[in-house]
Amino acid sequence: MRRAGILLDVRSVAHGGQPGDLRRACIAWVNTLAGSGLSLWQILPLNPVDGVGSPYASRAANAIDPSLHPELAGDITVTASEVTAALESQPWLRRFAVFEALREVHGAPWTVWPLAIRNAGLNLDVTVDETRLRHHAAVQVALGRAWQAVQAAAAEAQVLIVGDMPLYVAEDSVDVWSAPHLFELDERGRAQQRAGVPPDIFSDTGQLWGNPVYAWAAHVEEGFAWWHQRVARLAELVDVVRLDHFIGIVRAWSIPGDAPDARTGEWIDVPGASLLSALDDIDVAFIAEDLGLVTPAVKQLRNERHLLGMAIHQFGFGGDAYAPHTPSLTPEDVVAYPGTHDNDTVLGWWTDADETTQQRAVTAGVEPSAPVRSLLQMGLACPARWYIAPLQDVLGLGAEARMNVPSTVGPHNWSWRANDDHMSREAIAWFGEVAKAHGRR
């Protein structure tokens, strides 16, 4: 089915700020989408954000961001028996609650905790304050119930929630602390090998992300149980999972832990086919974020698994090498975007584009007098099975509304928030009307 929808982080949804207001705003939002003839809501990861607001270097792969609790679930009462039942039935929740309780007492990162506590994660062989533990568990139970209400509204409105799974987790995370043998660590728990990407035309030194690289042999030995639990948990929260950095489950750029940048890394093979096969029994669809250095092996795995890939139309005017990202040449088996959270808004991109890029775009059909709407119209008309645009682009906002500038840190990232006017503007209705005209819903 040809579908269309909007990318909007849950944290960016406009709401009143009172307990439960964000939950009610999310429910209203899915009804707005459905009422506009749209059927996709893509979100950024729901996991806890890091110290600079990014959800892509989380301290917990299975938890919902506790900072969302007051506005999303602050009006929900959780009983002691519910907390006990959740702790007994969900092993990830006990690990997370113990980890959070220890962080409150000992601070972060866990790699500098006292030795006995540092080494206690695998079997949770540690004593923690029960009140703290149960508090963190109760917050997760409340968040889970709140999100279930949003999911129920989306299901009734026939809107699919498209989630996002970062490939890696943070070094200072419950995941690494509780399963250190699954990561390439030294004796103190610090990453011996770190993730990133090699130098390219955009960066002479590559990108050093800092996340610990997986000890893939250990994952194979355990039948990918850690991954199965992680994806099964995410499948409880969303209908579709975007596999971030899909090329990294075929081969990964592994950088020495003490390297100052990514230049000294090396490629390591990753058992991606076996990993995906281990997830076959989980009822969730995947989107492969196959951007970057796409090798024949990456293409082969995506095709074998019949996964939708991705196309970014802002990239489509850079010459022949970027032809698959050109709207009219976009393949059918992809999800197309004008840009994602890592790109500038369309208006910001157009404003900064050089003359050659603008001319190529105009030749392809972009109208200089209306670059945003014309590119969105081209996207909605393109062959891609699904088309998703950030809300900022549907609204025609400029670079000030950009969500993230990769490889930078600062208040300009992860801070954009919609207001009430944004959430109900006629632009959303226009987007839905054009989608319908091109056979999408």
What name fits each language-model region?
Residues M1-D9, H15-G16, V52-G144, Y168-I388, ...:
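Alpha-amylase-like alpha-glycosidases and glucanotransferases acting on alpha-linked glucans and related
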Residues M1-I27, N31-G37:
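Mature N-terminal, pre-catalytic/accessory segment of carbohydrate-active enzymes
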Residues R24-N31, R145-A153, H228-Q229, P371-L375:
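Short alpha-helical segments and helix-capping/turn motifs at coil-helix boundaries
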Residues R24-V49, R233-V240, A381:
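Catalytic domains of carbohydrate-active enzymes, especially glycoside hydrolases
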Residues A34, W147-A157, D280, R302-N303:
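Surface-exposed amphipathic alpha-helices with a cationic face
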Residues L44, L160-V162, P166, V240, ...:
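Outer-envelope exported proteins of Gram-negative bacteria
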Residues A137-V169:
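Conserved, well-ordered alpha-helix/loop/beta-strand core segments that scaffold catalytic motifs
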Residues W416, D421-R441:
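Terminal-tail/helix-coil boundary detector
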